[in-house]
């Protein structure tokens, strides 16, 4: 065509490619069936930022955890579901003991998460770091079979050293010790001599969701494992808001004061549910292919220790998407 230069062809190609990418990614956003606000926000980013918007969406727009990790969880799902069915038969709570709004919430949670409503547990609130560290170290020192710890942040120093020494003592007694530490939140710990010392003693320390430029192409790097769980001998469990970090020493240079956290110490059937979450995470991350959660995870039939009704609501890969948000909305709508 007269007057149509090579530069014009290049410009036309770039223009066409740009709009094909924008429209294609906008259609993908719509097909993901997010909330209206989230969908419009992502479409705005894609349309208003040529090429860059699509790259941002690829990195942050979808909950991609990696194909292999997803396949590993699907492999253990049947075993997990069988164990949950058995747990339900053994320790199911009577929904009629709950208020109507609580029954509706429990029914919704069971359908979305698959974890049953359990009775017969005891729950002790540990309101500060002093109580948490003291009880945890004591329980680890009394462990006979397994110590399982999963934390988003593991930060060396302060009273965390007491936990580390307790783990080393447990290994000397022949106790199986496993630690899950998030690659981002626990970077300081995972690169430290303390971690190497634990591994040398036989503690299985696993870096959860490793990060890297290459991995960015296949998995979102901002999706982290934020669990704070401890399960000891399949009989004692801890969960709550405190990471494995001493508030007196953790990032004190920031100058914002000590973090205020709390945990609960649980005994009874609820501990088995916590143990299952840890084991499913550990198996998914390591591909160890546990043949039997009960035998290798230290789980066993637990007699009632109290009268508290509990239900575990786990999030993360393999579990229902948006389930936590839906549960909170269900609770709010049922408020009286």
What positions do the PLM features span?
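N-terminal localization/anchoring segments of enzymes in phospholipid and broader phosphate metabolism
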Residues: 1-334
């Amino acid at each position: 065509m007269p007057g149509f230069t090579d530069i014009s062809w290049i410009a036309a190609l770039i223009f066409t490619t740009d709009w094909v990418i924008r429209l294609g990614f906008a259609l993908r956003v719509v097909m993901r069936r997010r909330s209206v606000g989230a969908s419009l926000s992502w479409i705005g980013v894609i349309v208003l930022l040529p090429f860059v918007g699509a790259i941002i969406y690829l990195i942050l727009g979808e909950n991609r955890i990696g194909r292999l990790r997803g396949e590993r969880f699907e492999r253990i799902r049947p075993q997990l579901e069988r164990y949950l069915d058995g747990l339900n038969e053994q320790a199911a709570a009577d929904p009629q003991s709950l208020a109507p709004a609580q029954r509706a919430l429990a029914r919704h949670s069971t359908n979305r998460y698959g974890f049953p409503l359990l009775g017969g547990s005891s729950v002790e609130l540990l309101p500060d770091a002093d109580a948490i560290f003291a009880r945890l170290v004591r329980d680890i020192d009394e462990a006979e079979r397994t110590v399982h710890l999963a934390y988003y942040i593991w930060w060396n120093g302060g009273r965390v050293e007491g936990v580390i020494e307790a783990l080393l003592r447990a290994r000397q007694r022949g106790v199986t010790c496993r630690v899950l530490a998030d690659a981002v939140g626990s970077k300081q710990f995972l690169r430290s001599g303390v971690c190497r010392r634990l591994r040398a003693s036989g503690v299985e320390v696993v870096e959860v969701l490793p990060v890297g430029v290459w991995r960015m192409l296949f998995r979102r790097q901002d999706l982290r494992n934020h669990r704070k769980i401890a399960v000891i001998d399949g009989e004692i469990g801890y969960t709550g808001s405190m990471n494995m970090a001493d508030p007196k020493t953790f990032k004190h240079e920031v100058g914002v004061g000590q973090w205020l956290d709390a945990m609960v110490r649980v005994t009874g059937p609820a501990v088995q549910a916590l143990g299952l979450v840890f084991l499913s995470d550990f198996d998914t991350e390591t591909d160890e292919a546990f043949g039997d959660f009960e035998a290798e995870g230290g789980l066993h039939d637990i007699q009632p220790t109290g009268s508290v009704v509990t239900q575990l609501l786990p999030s993360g890969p393999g579990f229902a998407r948006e389930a936590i948000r839906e549960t909170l909305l269900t609770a709010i709508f049922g408020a009286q």
